[in-house]
């Protein structure tokens, strides 16, 4: 499946003389991550994530763990937090918990963000500076994935297990109820063959609503898939209402 990423763009403007007016381009700089989520085992010593620079120039890689509302989380550090990664090269970053108490009976959720920072004119760390003289606009992409904190007493998620999500109708809306201590990402959901807009991540024992199209039946068949620890999709699940 397509990697699940939250992408934010930061724009960097560069002065450009008339000589290079015809060479103005927009180029994105991002890091390619080796997974769509990281499962952090709270009884472990940290987790690693592969990071690749697909560009033809070096970039800076800046990584951090965030809370809801895009606030920095001091309970986790990423090492190295900022480093140069040469063109077409890849390496690992390490996520380590240094503080914090988290529930032992269910998963918790954070966000891991990795930004690719493009070279600027005058940067001593950048090579081949001439390649960027004619460039007016560089776009720095901040790629964010789920960092799921899993207590040691919870086994690996079995995405094909039955009875994990219960469905119902409430006030004309479809209700999804998570009956497990795991976080679920629901994809390819439909009701009586009509596609449904996924309401984001469904937390442990949480309920969320799907808005149903008007004039739709209040009973029928729900189909959906969930995403596993490695980013794989489950078998198609079914629930009759």
Swiss-Prot record:
Q: Which InterPro entries match?
A: Ig-like_fold, PapD-like_sf, Periplasmic_pilus_chap, Pili_assmbl_chap_C_dom_sf, Pili_assmbl_chaperone_bac, Pili_assmbl_chaperone_C, Pili_assmbl_chaperone_CS, Pili_assmbl_chaperone_N
UniProt keywords, alphabetically:
Chaperone, Disulfide bond, Fimbrium biogenesis, Immunoglobulin domain, Periplasm, Signal
Q: List S-S links within the chain.
A: 113-144
The record's GO CC annotations read: outer membrane-bounded periplasmic space
Pfam families in the cross-refs = PapD_C (PF02753), PapD_N (PF00345)
Which terms does the UniProt entry file under GO BP? cell wall organization; chaperone-mediated protein folding
What is the residue range of the signal peptide feature?
1-21
Which compartments does it reside in? Answer: Periplasm
Coiled coil feature spans? none
Record has Chaperone as a keyword: yes
Q: Would the keyword Chaperone be found if you checked this record's keyword annotation?
A: yes
Q: Which family does it belong to?
A: Belongs to the periplasmic pilus chaperone family.
* PANTHER family referenced in this protein's UniProt entry, alphabetically: CHAPERONE PROTEIN CAF1M, PILUS ASSEMBLY CHAPERONE
Functional note? This protein is essential for the biogenesis of mature CS3 pili.
Q: What is this protein called?
A: Chaperone protein CS3-1
